[in-house]
Swiss-Prot record:
Location of region: Disordered: 439-470
Lineage, broadest ranks: Bacteria, Pseudomonadati, Pseudomonadota, Alphaproteobacteria, Hyphomicrobiales
Gene source species: Xanthobacter autotrophicus (strain ATCC BAA-1158 / Py2)
Sequence positions that bind [4Fe-4S] cluster 1: 14, 50, 85
Cofactor notes: Binds 2 [4Fe-4S] clusters. One cluster is coordinated with 3 cysteines and an exchangeable S-adenosyl-L-methionine.
The MTTase N-terminal domain, residue ranges: 5-122
The protein's name: tRNA-2-methylthio-N(6)-dimethylallyladenosine synthase
InterPro entries on file: Elp3/MiaA/NifB-like_rSAM, Methylthiotransferase, Methylthiotransferase_CS, Methylthiotransferase_N, Methylthiotransferase_N_sf, MiaB_methiolase, rSAM, rSAM_horseshoe
């Protein structure tokens, strides 16, 4: 009996890459591959890449250099594939820079992996970055029950890909293509299958998810709000989320869904990028700061317990001190529970990359640090406001200590619970007793509170809140 071939997949970047990595693994499982967590023992390594910032792309080449050295030292014949947005953007250039790569495959061709691998194994240098007309989702197999259970009780479902917004800093329209929405029936089939396999929480994902306009089973075009209303009726589905959204597509129906659907979590990730109207216009965001404030006000009226997350770019070409102060002002006024902040990174082929007024790196670094301090304080204040409150926590995985389980709050916070009277996949009502820099701790709502000295998070080391260049 032959040993099964081993597959190692490493995902960089967004949730959609995680979803795509799972689907690639499901596809290759049919070819006899089993996943491993050790690239050294893999017969095939896939790097599923992100191209949104220069540092993210360069991480891929660093990883390829490490894999090349590993192959040479071990004398192995491991095949190496580069997938994702770097593959789409750079194509054959990847093989020129890193000859160790056997296969380059773009996001729309994952269903062709078995035949592409066969070509690569036969000695061909394979690059497939086409945007085929057929729906790749029609050709990707569903995960097995065992695969779904191994990934935990929370799952992603892609409902939309691509973006038509063409923000001047962004490569997504070029690497993922135009906006395409999946048919409602296919989405519902996938969601129902996941719930049947034990999933309790589904996050609907897309590059611009709230632009969803899928063909409904009744012959009409469905919005994201209507899709979620339908999905919320699935027996056994406890939670719904969606990401990533664009302010231009936050309509009243979607806001009302947060009011009307108890399964829809009171947490919204809504990237604003800048608090300056001048910079927002230069970014081609097609909304202003007052538009953003109006959305937040409506959202909080519809769902008073709503918490917000966002993305920010500092040092966009032409950003003045006044523009940056406008961003700080927006952060103070909104009060974010979490946020991601980045230095502007010029991406080849985007309009902003050719802008004359590039901001010096040292200025970008100073502004990022200042913004990060403010966002960190905002996050800490929100986390502290959760102390003493009671939430339903979805238990997702074991903790580091015996008897611990770790779950997620409605606000995506990691919550540690000692010896819970529940199992992974259960929703447990928990009272938050302690707040650490990276997680919360709690006890079952009917239990007594532990002392601070017993807290599993009280001594945790702090880390910056997603302060990134990549």
């Amino acid at each position: 009996m032959h040993e099964p071939r081993k597959l190692y997949v490493k995902s960089f970047g967004c949730q959609m890459n995680v979803y795509d990595s799972h689907r690639m693994a499901d596809t290759l499982a049919r070819e006899g591959f089993v996943e491993t967590q050790d690239p050294a023992e893999a017969d095939l390594v896939i790097l599923n890449t992100c191209h949104i910032r220069e540092k993210a792309a360069e991480k891929v080449y660093s990883e390829l250099g490490r894999l090349r050295k590993q192959k040479q030292e071990a004398g192995s014949d491991t095949m190496i594939a580069v997938a994702g947005c770097v593959a789409q953007a750079e194509g054959a250039e990847i093989m020129r820079r890193a000859p160790v790569v056997d296969l380059v495959v773009g996001p729309q061709s994952y269903h062709r992996l078995p035949e592409l691998l066969a070509e690569a194994k036969a000695g061909k240098r394979v690059v497939d970055t086409e945007f085929p007309a057929e729906d790749k989702f029609d050709h990707l197999p569903a995960p097995t029950r065992a695969a779904t259970r191994s990934r935990g009780p929370a799952a992603f479902v892609t409902v939309q890909e691509g973006c038509d917004k063409f923000c001047t800093f962004c490569v997504v329209p070029y690497t993922r293509g135009a906006e395409v929405s999946r048919p409602v029936a296919k989405i519902m089939d996938e969601a129902a299958r996941l719930v049947d396999q034990g999933v309790r929480e589904i996050s609907l994902i897309g590059q611009n998810v709230n632009a969803f306009h899928g063909a409904g089973p009744d012959g009409t075009t469905w919005s994201l709000a209507r899709l979620m209303e339908h999905m919320a009726r699935l027996d056994g589905l406890a939670r719904l989320r969606y990401t990533t959204s664009h302010p231009r597509d936050m309509d009243d129906d979607l806001i009302a869904a947060h009011r009307d659907l108890p399964q829809l979590m009171p947490y919204l990730h809504l990237p604003v990028q800048s608090g300056s109207d001048r910079i927002l216009a230069a970014m081609n965001r097609k909304h202003g700061r007052d538009d953003f404030f109006a959305i937040i006000e409506k959202m909080r009226q519809a769902r008073p317990d709503m918490a917000l997350s966002s993305d920010f770019i500092v040092g966009f070409p032409g950003e003045s001190e006044k523009d940056f102060e406008d961003t700080l002002d927006l952060v103070r006024r909104v009060g974010f529970a979490s946020a991601y902040s980045f230095k502007y990174s010029p991406r080849p082929g985007t309009p902003a990359a050719d802008h004359d007024a590039q901001v010096p790196e040292e200025v970008k670094a100073e502004r990022l640090a200042e913004l990060q301090r403010l966002l960190e304080a905002s996050k800490a204040a929100f986390d502290e406001s959760c102390r003493g409150r009671t939430f339903d926590i979805l238990l997702e995985k074991p903790g580091r200590q015996a008897g611990q389980l770790i779950g997620r709050s409605p606000y995506l916070q990691s919550v540690v619970v000692n010896d819970p009277p529940a199992a992974i996949g259960d929703l447990l009502t928990v009272t938050i007793t302690d707040v650490g820099p990276n997680s919360l701790a709690g006890v079952p709502a009917e239990a007594s509170e532990p002392s601070v000295s017993q807290s599993p998070v009280s001594s945790a080391r702090s880390r910056p809140l997603a302060a990134m260049e990549a």
